[in-house]
């Protein structure tokens, strides 16, 4: 792996640190490398949760590397598997990802965070999609995912004017899960990761599958879809060893031992 990415495995938790001074900006080469990391995470049966963060205390990521852009890298360049930053276009990832946002998350950096399942941010974090002020658009998920979270008036202001949103406002709107001090950020993200590890992996996979396939459906239609047999993970949960282990462990007053099958 390159000097731009630092990987740490803590049991079944993978920590990914983006380290590209001065702003953890992402060029196509780095994006390719991040895509390989996330795909390897997806396919590694020993890994359950990933945490993505930025080096330092100022920038999570400033998004697309404008220096690379000035040198000829196009906005529609091939950013590799998983799309920009390796995560924004992985639509079949059945394991949870936590974005530990340690500072500014601008442009593609915000889009990377939005592609995660959870956002834990430091109290100095700030979020923005300033692409329109640069003559481009936030098309790595920002203009698609943000409207699912925020009211149209807030989305319009953020994407059309580049308005920044601070950590506390992001918490009020439900953009982030938690706001903690910079010193507590990684410990808090790891605590959340461990809570996810404590849940059954097949159940987590089924939940993610249900979310992504039914979120736009009316409830009645979604019920029919889930029970039609077309999903992969949901039926696997119902007939799994873990579905037996969970109630048994509860009855025996012990922690469950998940097998993922």
UniProtKB/Swiss-Prot annotation:
Keywords: Lyase. It holds the Pfam family ECH_1. Pathway: Amine and polyamine metabolism; carnitine metabolism. GO terms for biological process: carnitine metabolic process; fatty acid beta-oxidation. It comes from the Bacteria. Coiled coil: none annotated. It catalyses: (R)-carnitinyl-CoA = crotonobetainyl-CoA + H2O. GO terms for molecular function: hydro-lyase activity; L-carnitine CoA-transferase activity. InterPro entries: Carnitinyl_CoA_dehydratase (IPR022852), ClpP/crotonase-like_dom_sf (IPR029045), Enoyl-CoA_hyd/isom_CS (IPR018376), Enoyl-CoA_hydra/iso (IPR001753), Enoyl-CoA_hydra_C (IPR014748). Signal peptide: none annotated. The active site is at residues 111, 131. Catalyzes the reversible dehydration of L-carnitinyl-CoA to crotonobetainyl-CoA. HAMAP family: CaiD. NCBIfam families: PRK03580.1 (NF002936). Belongs to the enoyl-CoA hydratase/isomerase family. This is Carnitinyl-CoA dehydratase. It comes from Escherichia coli (strain SMS-3-5 / SECEC).
